[in-house]
Amino acid sequence: MVTIRLARHGAKKRPFYQIVVADSRNSVTGRFIEKVGFFNPTAQGQEEGLRLDLDRVNHWVGQGASLSDRVAKLVKDAQKAA
């Protein structure tokens, strides 16, 4: 099953997440199909906190991909902002 989920990157105590489309059987930070955005929960000032390609997310959801709980909230926020 294909899932759109967060893959953690960054340093210790400085999380940075890539939003990726991946097979649910692969590890969280392992192999993925496509990057569709990023999420920076510690963004300050002019730093961009969320970038999401909504066209690609909608494409993958149309193909049957499921969203993780956190990604579903981020997509909802991105649609509200757009």
UniProtKB/Swiss-Prot annotation:
Task: Give one Pfam family.
Answer: Ribosomal_S16
Asked whether the UniProt record includes Ribosomal protein among its keywords, one would answer yes
Gene3D superfamilies given for it?
3.30.1320.10
Q: Which GO terms describe its cellular component?
A: cytoplasm; small ribosomal subunit
Per UniProt, what is the name of the gene that codes for the protein in this document? rpsP
Name the keywords, alphabetized.
Ribonucleoprotein, Ribosomal protein
Write down the HAMAP family for this protein, in alphabetical order.
Ribosomal_bS16 (MF_00385)
One GO MF annotation is:
structural constituent of ribosome
Note the InterPro entries from the entry: Ribosomal_bS16 (IPR000307), Ribosomal_bS16_CS (IPR020592), Ribosomal_bS16_dom_sf (IPR023803)
Gene Ontology biological-process annotations: translation
The record's comment on protein family reads:
Belongs to the bacterial ribosomal protein bS16 family.
Name assigned to this protein: Small ribosomal subunit protein bS16
